[in-house]
Protein backbone atom coordinates (compact mmCIF):
# COMPACT_ATOMS: atom_id res chain seq x y z
CA UNK A 1 0.00 0.00 0.00
CA UNK A 2 1.35 3.40 -1.01
CA UNK A 3 0.25 6.30 1.23
CA UNK A 4 0.64 9.69 -0.46
CA UNK A 5 0.15 13.01 1.31
CA UNK A 6 -1.46 15.69 -0.86
CA UNK A 7 -1.11 19.17 0.59
CA UNK A 8 -1.23 22.81 -0.49
CA UNK A 9 -2.43 26.16 0.74
CA UNK A 10 -6.10 27.05 0.93
CA UNK A 11 -7.47 27.71 -2.57
CA UNK A 12 -4.59 25.96 -4.34
CA UNK A 13 -6.77 23.29 -5.97
CA UNK A 14 -5.92 20.25 -3.84
CA UNK A 15 -9.42 18.85 -4.16
CA UNK A 16 -9.31 19.04 -7.97
CA UNK A 17 -6.04 17.12 -7.95
CA UNK A 18 -7.45 14.55 -5.50
CA UNK A 19 -10.50 14.09 -7.76
CA UNK A 20 -8.25 13.42 -10.76
CA UNK A 21 -6.18 10.89 -8.81
CA UNK A 22 -9.42 9.17 -7.76
CA UNK A 23 -10.53 8.94 -11.40
CA UNK A 24 -7.20 7.28 -12.20
CA UNK A 25 -7.78 4.59 -9.56
CA UNK A 26 -6.58 5.83 -6.19
CA UNK A 27 -8.43 5.75 -2.89
CA UNK A 28 -8.87 9.30 -1.61
CA UNK A 29 -9.27 10.45 1.99
CA UNK A 30 -9.77 14.06 3.04
CA UNK A 31 -8.40 15.07 6.45
CA UNK A 32 -10.90 17.94 6.64
CA UNK A 33 -13.79 15.55 6.04
CA UNK A 34 -12.47 13.17 8.70
CA UNK A 35 -12.13 16.17 11.03
CA UNK A 36 -15.82 16.98 10.47
CA UNK A 37 -16.75 13.40 11.33
CA UNK A 38 -14.53 13.58 14.43
CA UNK A 39 -16.63 16.41 15.91
CA UNK A 40 -20.12 15.39 14.75
CA UNK A 41 -22.87 15.63 17.34
CA UNK A 42 -22.80 12.55 19.56
CA UNK A 43 -19.06 11.99 19.24
CA UNK A 44 -16.44 12.30 21.96
CA UNK A 45 -14.80 15.03 19.90
CA UNK A 46 -18.02 17.07 19.82
CA UNK A 47 -18.27 17.04 23.62
CA UNK A 48 -14.62 18.04 24.03
CA UNK A 49 -14.88 20.92 21.53
CA UNK A 50 -18.04 22.33 23.15
CA UNK A 51 -16.48 22.01 26.61
CA UNK A 52 -13.36 23.82 25.38
CA UNK A 53 -14.96 26.62 23.34
CA UNK A 54 -18.42 26.99 24.88
CA UNK A 55 -21.99 27.03 23.55
CA UNK A 56 -21.19 30.11 21.43
CA UNK A 57 -19.92 27.78 18.68
CA UNK A 58 -23.23 25.90 18.45
CA UNK A 59 -25.96 26.51 15.90
CA UNK A 60 -29.15 24.41 16.07
CA UNK A 61 -27.33 21.91 18.28
CA UNK A 62 -24.42 21.36 15.90
CA UNK A 63 -20.98 22.94 15.77
CA UNK A 64 -21.02 26.03 13.56
CA UNK A 65 -17.82 25.42 11.59
CA UNK A 66 -17.70 28.98 10.32
CA UNK A 67 -17.86 30.42 13.83
CA UNK A 68 -15.30 27.90 15.09
CA UNK A 69 -13.09 28.78 12.12
CA UNK A 70 -13.21 32.47 12.96
CA UNK A 71 -12.06 31.69 16.50
CA UNK A 72 -9.18 29.38 15.63
CA UNK A 73 -7.85 31.39 12.69
CA UNK A 74 -7.60 34.51 14.86
CA UNK A 75 -6.18 32.84 17.98
CA UNK A 76 -3.16 30.50 17.71
CA UNK A 77 -3.78 29.10 21.20
CA UNK A 78 -7.36 28.16 20.32
CA UNK A 79 -6.09 26.54 17.13
CA UNK A 80 -3.68 24.36 19.12
CA UNK A 81 -6.45 23.34 21.52
CA UNK A 82 -8.71 22.29 18.66
CA UNK A 83 -5.93 20.35 16.93
CA UNK A 84 -5.15 18.48 20.17
CA UNK A 85 -8.76 17.25 20.20
CA UNK A 86 -9.26 16.57 16.50
CA UNK A 87 -5.93 15.24 15.16
CA UNK A 88 -5.75 12.01 17.21
CA UNK A 89 -9.34 11.15 16.28
CA UNK A 90 -8.71 11.86 12.58
CA UNK A 91 -5.70 9.55 12.67
CA UNK A 92 -7.79 6.81 14.32
CA UNK A 93 -10.53 7.13 11.67
CA UNK A 94 -7.96 6.93 8.87
CA UNK A 95 -6.27 3.85 10.34
CA UNK A 96 -9.67 2.14 10.66
CA UNK A 97 -10.56 2.94 7.03
CA UNK A 98 -7.21 1.65 5.73
CA UNK A 99 -7.91 -1.82 7.12
CA UNK A 100 -10.52 -2.40 4.41
CA UNK A 101 -8.25 -1.49 1.47
CA UNK A 102 -6.32 -3.94 -0.75
CA UNK A 103 -2.58 -4.27 -0.13
CA UNK A 104 -1.71 -2.80 -3.55
CA UNK A 105 -3.87 0.32 -3.04
CA UNK A 106 -2.58 3.79 -3.81
CA UNK A 107 -4.02 6.07 -1.13
CA UNK A 108 -4.16 9.84 -1.60
CA UNK A 109 -4.55 11.59 1.76
CA UNK A 110 -5.57 15.22 1.32
CA UNK A 111 -4.01 17.06 4.27
CA UNK A 112 -3.89 20.87 4.22
CA UNK A 113 -1.70 21.04 7.34
CA UNK A 114 1.06 18.57 6.47
CA UNK A 115 3.89 20.99 7.32
CA UNK A 116 2.16 22.41 10.39
CA UNK A 117 1.32 19.01 11.88
CA UNK A 118 4.84 17.57 11.45
CA UNK A 119 3.27 14.38 10.11
CA UNK A 120 5.38 13.89 6.96
CA UNK A 121 6.91 10.70 8.39
CA UNK A 122 3.49 8.99 8.26
CA UNK A 123 3.55 9.03 4.44
CA UNK A 124 5.56 7.24 1.77
CA UNK A 125 5.47 10.22 -0.60
CA UNK A 126 4.24 13.81 -0.46
CA UNK A 127 2.92 16.20 -3.11
CA UNK A 128 2.03 19.87 -2.71
CA UNK A 129 -0.30 21.80 -5.02
CA UNK A 130 0.75 25.44 -5.34
CA UNK A 131 -0.90 28.50 -6.91
CA UNK A 132 -0.05 32.18 -6.83
CA UNK A 133 -1.79 34.30 -4.19
CA UNK A 134 -3.97 36.16 -6.72
CA UNK A 135 -5.35 32.92 -8.16
CA UNK A 136 -6.01 31.47 -4.72
CA UNK A 137 -7.73 34.67 -3.57
CA UNK A 138 -9.99 34.66 -6.63
CA UNK A 139 -11.00 31.03 -6.04
CA UNK A 140 -11.74 31.66 -2.37
CA UNK A 141 -13.89 34.71 -3.15
CA UNK A 142 -15.91 32.49 -5.49
CA UNK A 143 -16.47 30.19 -2.49
CA UNK A 144 -17.95 33.11 -0.58
CA UNK A 145 -15.09 33.96 1.76
CA UNK A 146 -14.58 37.64 2.60
CA UNK A 147 -11.21 39.31 2.01
CA UNK A 148 -10.34 39.47 5.73
CA UNK A 149 -11.15 35.77 6.12
CA UNK A 150 -8.92 34.89 3.17
CA UNK A 151 -6.00 36.92 4.52
CA UNK A 152 -6.39 35.37 7.99
CA UNK A 153 -6.57 31.80 6.73
CA UNK A 154 -3.60 32.17 4.41
CA UNK A 155 -1.57 33.75 7.22
CA UNK A 156 -2.46 30.88 9.57
CA UNK A 157 -1.02 28.28 7.18
CA UNK A 158 2.58 27.37 6.41
CA UNK A 159 4.38 29.31 3.70
CA UNK A 160 4.86 27.94 0.21
CA UNK A 161 8.55 27.40 1.00
CA UNK A 162 7.72 25.41 4.12
CA UNK A 163 5.21 23.21 2.29
CA UNK A 164 7.64 22.57 -0.57
CA UNK A 165 10.41 21.63 1.89
CA UNK A 166 8.17 18.84 3.28
CA UNK A 167 7.28 17.40 -0.13
CA UNK A 168 8.82 15.27 -2.86
CA UNK A 169 6.99 16.92 -5.73
CA UNK A 170 5.28 20.24 -6.55
CA UNK A 171 2.25 20.65 -8.85
CA UNK A 172 1.83 24.22 -10.09
CA UNK A 173 -1.86 25.03 -10.57
CA UNK A 174 -2.53 28.51 -11.90
CA UNK A 175 -5.65 27.99 -13.92
CA UNK A 176 -5.62 25.62 -16.89
CA UNK A 177 -7.69 22.53 -16.01
CA UNK A 178 -6.45 20.51 -19.00
CA UNK A 179 -2.82 21.19 -18.10
CA UNK A 180 -3.52 20.20 -14.49
CA UNK A 181 -5.12 16.93 -15.56
CA UNK A 182 -2.15 16.14 -17.81
CA UNK A 183 0.26 16.80 -14.92
CA UNK A 184 -1.71 14.51 -12.61
CA UNK A 185 -1.83 11.74 -15.23
CA UNK A 186 1.92 12.02 -15.78
CA UNK A 187 2.62 11.81 -12.03
CA UNK A 188 0.31 8.81 -11.75
CA UNK A 189 2.02 6.92 -14.56
CA UNK A 190 5.65 7.89 -13.98
CA UNK A 191 5.81 8.24 -10.19
CA UNK A 192 2.95 6.71 -8.20
CA UNK A 193 2.34 3.48 -10.13
CA UNK A 194 6.06 2.53 -10.07
CA UNK A 195 6.29 3.43 -6.36
CA UNK A 196 3.22 1.35 -5.58
CA UNK A 197 4.92 -1.74 -6.99
CA UNK A 198 7.56 -1.52 -4.27
CA UNK A 199 5.08 -0.66 -1.48
CA UNK A 200 2.41 -3.24 -2.33
CA UNK A 201 4.39 -6.26 -1.24
Where are these regions (language model features)?
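Walker A/P-loop
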Residues: 15
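P-loop (Walker A) phosphate-binding loop of NTP-binding proteins
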Residues: 9, 21
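ATP-dependent small-molecule kinase phosphotransfer cores
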Residues: 33-105
Amino acid sequence: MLIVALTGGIGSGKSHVAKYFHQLGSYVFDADQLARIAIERGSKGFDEVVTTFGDQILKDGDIDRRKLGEIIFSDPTAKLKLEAIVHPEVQRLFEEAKKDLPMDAIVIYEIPLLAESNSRNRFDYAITVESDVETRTSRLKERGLASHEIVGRMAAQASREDRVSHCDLVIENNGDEDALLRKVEEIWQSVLLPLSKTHGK
